[in-house]
Amino acid sequence: MADWSLLPNDLLELIVGHLETSFEIVLFRSVCRSWRSVVPPLDHSRCLGIKTHDISFNAGFTFSDQPTDQPPFKSSVDCTLKNIPIYLVKFWTPYGDDYLIAEMREREGGEPKLLLSPLSSNRIIYGMGINKVLFNSLTSPIIPFGQYYEITYFKKQPIRYRYGLPYHLWNEVEWVETSERVEFLRLHSEDSRDFAVLFAGRMCNLVMYRSRNMSWTQVVEHPETYAYQDLVAFKGKFYALDSSGRGRVFVVELSLRVTEIPSVKGSQYCSKESLVQLGEELLLVQRFIPAGRRYDEYIYTWFKVFRLDEEGGKRKWVQVNYLNDRVIFLGARTKLCCSVHKLPGANENCIVFLASNDGSIFDNDSVLLFDLKTRRTNTAFNECKGYMGVFGANLKSLVSCGLVTIPNPTTRFLL
């Protein structure tokens, strides 16, 4: 095995020149002492930034399929593409090895990073009611685990009733900041800056942004106008899954050509579907609830998993009954899939998902687990404590090793 500490300084300085955020510098400095000597410590007041791109809106463009003469956006430059990183933090406690999976967000005024659960829609904040969550990158490995992209922009929205707002203003409009999940595809170019973005939101049409043209373009719709419930960038193309519940997936090429992958044979209607990427594989995951059952009756929930087969140049879905040592996490804004060897105490061949249809987490019973081998569904934390770190529910471990500090009740102000 190569000794990374022996790399020459000029090569290390070249690597540092390609780091895009200060958090990447923190990770670089955590490798070994010789690497830390190349880059001075960061000022603690400095924000650990995330990667962003400014995206312009072409004149008359809207995210609907109808052009308009009225500017639908506050400014032609008020759209920002953000890369949201997800990290796996490993640590050691008196109870054994443990981990935390966290999405990191900006906060204003140079405050510490905000740690969120990447899988919940109600934006569970790690450290809520707790003074600090401290990571020592020298003793707790911080490993890039995943990422997703979103665009943030201002749009017009009718003013809803507010306490104290005069009645005659209720029909007025206001500019509201909006964030939407998108898929990002980096393209090959000389300066490595060319990219494409695909966006669906809650619409029945797709729009694509090309950095080379600096404009958005409507993608031709397929004949049946279902909304799209999931998008993924895979092997230089976009894949869009509609909400028909029949496993209908469309391949969207950069030329705006759209082709449909033959639906899963004999597929029955499912309540929810997701596209999950694992390395060089693309998975279609279908969730079923028998007719007449409610979402909260999780014991009746079951899943099917299919792998995209591209052999012979023809795409088709092949059912998968075993995930080997892997586990799939289905969240509200992102999906993750990895080997359980990366997650201490986790069970393999499972799908971890959320009980509510909107991806909200209210308590530990909101997180469920489906075992592909036994075909049983149970609450995840009762079935396997190793999944608590995915949702920050392992507070006892976090406190025991000093990553989390609990407020001193004698010095805390009560409001």
Swiss-Prot record:
Give a single Pfam family match: F-box
The segment(s) forming the F-box domain are 2-50
Please, which domain of life does this record's source organism belong to? Eukaryota
InterPro entries xref list: F-box-like_dom_sf (IPR036047), F-box_dom (IPR001810), Gal_Oxase/kelch_b-propeller (IPR011043), KIB1-4_b-propeller (IPR005174), SCF_F-box_domain (IPR051304)
- Stored SUPFAM superfamilies: F-box domain (SSF81383), Galactose oxidase, central domain (SSF50965)
Under which name does UniProt file this protein?
Putative F-box protein At2g16290
Originating organism = Arabidopsis thaliana (Mouse-ear cress)
